[in-house]
Amino acid sequence: MRTADLFYALYARRLRRQTAAGPLPKHIGLIMDGNRRWARQMGMANPSIGHRYGAEHVESVLSWCETAGIKHVTVFVCSTENLQRRGDTEVSFLMQVIEQVVAVHLARPDARWQVRIAGTLDXPCADSTAHALKEAVEATRRCTTGSQVTLAIGYGGRQEVIDAVRELLHEQAAAGTTLEDLAASLTMDDITRHLYTAGQPDPDLVIRTSGEQRMSNFLLWQSAYSELYFCEAYWPAFREIDFLRALRSYAARQRRYGA
């Protein structure tokens, strides 16, 4: 073993001991940013190739979460804005990558993670991509031993709230509730139970890679009281020690939930 590898292993072991004392987040949100910039840094002719490396890296990070005992992970794969603003060639390549990675690593009979989807698949995603994602959800439905992994694809936080309100209005109209009665009785829980992530706990910790310090329309409602951690590494270069440092930072904080 090289000296650098030895020091890395020893440091990672030390971080694991530090984080084991907790507290640890029950739900982590991951904004996996920087695929294209990483590809440029690595000298790749086509920066979009970074999406493949980034997608392949998800399984490693999920394994770290599983080892740490994190039961819920939400991964921001691509936003509605990404799909609308990127060129057709890049979006098509991204859809192919998603299909292949989901099929190989997630939609398996021996799947370790239960897959859920947050977002709107039918409009922004290719038909084959939407089909692959729905198959992954169905194939892992009975997997209850590992973490629950939510893939936010074709996702926008503002649109999620709009869709939740719209669904609530339809539900209450069907029940015969007037707008006046609904306005008088409306609660945050009413909105929450109609979100894409209904039934899941809010994220305790949101990690964003690439050094950017913003939420980019990710889980806006759910992350109201989340702790935020920004890492300089690009997503494909995000290491286990970076992940463990995020957990260590979280454990050292005193959560105030807005107080």
Swiss-Prot record:
State the active site.
D33, N82 (proton acceptor)
Q: Specify which residues bind substrate according to the UniProt entry for this protein.
A: G34, N35, R36, R37, W38, H51, S79, T80, E81, R86, R208, R214, M215, S216
Which metal ions or organic cofactors does this protein require, according to UniProt?
Answer: Mg(2+)
Q: Please tell me which top-level EC class this enzyme sits in.
A: transferase
Q: Name one GO molecular function term.
A: Z-farnesyl diphosphate synthase activity
Role description: Catalyzes the condensation of isopentenyl diphosphate (IPP) with allylic pyrophosphates generating different type of terpenoids.
Task: Output this protein's name.
Answer: Isoprenyl transferase
Species name: Streptomyces fradiae
Lineage, highest ranks first: Bacteria, Bacillati, Actinomycetota, Actinomycetes, Kitasatosporales
Q: Which gene encodes it?
A: uppS
